[in-house]
Amino acid sequence: MAKLSLFRGCIVPNRYPGIEKATKLCLQKLEVDAVDLPGASCCPAPGVFKSFDKATWLALASRNIVLSERMGRDILTVCNGCYGSLADANIELKNDPEMKACTNSCLKEIGMEYKGTAEVRHIIEFLYKELGPEKLKSFITTPLDLKVALHYGCHLIKPSKERNLGETEAPVFFDELVEATGAKSVDYTDKMMCCGAGGGVRSGHAAESLEMLEHKLACIRNAGVDCIVNACPFCHLQFDRGQLAVNEKFGTDYSIPVLHYSQLLGLALGFSPDELGIEQNAIQNIEFLAKIYEISAGLR
C-alpha cells in the first residue's frame, strides 16, 4: 500500500477541521501510512485558475506535488476540487514535455523541480482501490443503522477517462464504501447533479447556486434519509451552511445533517461524534445527533 502525504486544502483547516481529524483517525485505524504535507498551499481551485491562467495553475499545483515527491509519498486529498486540480495537473505534466519544461522553469526560481514520481489520490478512490468494501468491513466495529443520501460531486468522477473509476453516469463505488459501514445508500432524483458550489457558481452567481441547491435538497428530503454524505469540503460547505441561505431565500425549513465520508466511516470505526468534529456543522439536527450518539454508545 502506498505511503501518503495528507493534503488538507483550504476549507478543511479553516472551516471544518473536524474532517481533518476524522480522516487522520480513520487512516490510523485502517493502518494506512499517512503524514502531514508541510508547506502546502492552495491546490489551486481548478474551476478558477485552470480556466483563466493555465501556466500559473500548473506552477502552483506542481509545487504541491513536488513537496510530496521529496517525501517519497503520494498525495492524498479529501476534497474533490483539490483532487481535480492536482490530479489533472499531474496528468498534464506527465504527458506534455513542453508544458513540463515551462513549469519547471518557474519552479527552478524557488529551487524545485517536478519529476512526476508521485501520484495524486482521493480518499474515496484510495479506499476503494487499495482496501475495497469487503476488507473495509473487517475494520467496522459499530455498524451504522442510517439511511444516507450520497453526493458524489463533480471532480471525483470526471473527466471519466482520467479517473479510471468505471461507470461515471451511474457509479456505485462510493455507494459500496458507504454500505460497508452498515449504512444504506438511498437512491434519489438527480443524485448526480452538481451541488451548485463549484466552478465559481457559489461565489459569482449566488442566486443560481442556491436554486440548484434547493432543488437537490428537495430531492434528498423526499428520499427520507437521515443525512447527506459527501467527499468534498466545498460540497460539504454548500450543503451545510447553504441550507441556512436556502431557508432564508425560499422560506424553507431544511435541517438535513451533513457528514463527510471520513466522519461517517469514523462513526463505524468506533469513534464518537465529538472526536469526529460533527458538532462543527452549522446544521445541528437534534434528532440526528441523538441517534448517532446512541449508535456510538451501543444503544442501537
From Swiss-Prot:
Keyword Chloroplast: no
Keywords attached to this entry: 4Fe-4S, Cytoplasm, Iron, Iron-sulfur, Metal-binding, Methanogenesis, Oxidoreductase
One biological process term in Gene Ontology: methanogenesis
Entry's EC annotation: 1.8.7.3, 1.8.98.4
Coiled coil: none
Catalytic activity from the UniProt record: coenzyme B + coenzyme M + 2 oxidized [2Fe-2S]-[ferredoxin] = coenzyme M-coenzyme B heterodisulfide + 2 reduced [2Fe-2S]-[ferredoxin] + 2 H(+); coenzyme B + 2 oxidized coenzyme F420-(gamma-L-Glu)(n) + coenzyme M + 2 reduced [2Fe-2S]-[ferredoxin] + 4 H(+) = coenzyme M-coenzyme B heterodisulfide + 2 reduced coenzyme F420-(gamma-L-Glu)(n) + 2 oxidized [2Fe-2S]-[ferredoxin]
Purpose of the protein: Part of a complex that catalyzes the reversible reduction of CoM-S-S-CoB to the thiol-coenzymes H-S-CoM (coenzyme M) and H-S-CoB (coenzyme B). Catalyzes the transfer of electrons from ferredoxin to CoM-S-S-CoB during methanogenesis from acetate. Electrons transfer from ferredoxin to CoM-S-S-CoB via HdrA2, HdrC2 and HdrB2. In addition, the complex can use electron bifurcation to direct electron pairs from reduced coenzyme F420 towards the reduction of both ferredoxin and CoB-CoM heterodisulfide. This activity may take place during Fe(III)-dependent anaerobic methane oxidation.
UniProt xrefs under PANTHER family: COB--COM HETERODISULFIDE REDUCTASE SUBUNIT B 1
Protein's recorded name: Ferredoxin/F(420)H(2)-dependent CoB-CoM heterodisulfide reductase subunit B
Encoding gene, per UniProt annotation: hdrB2
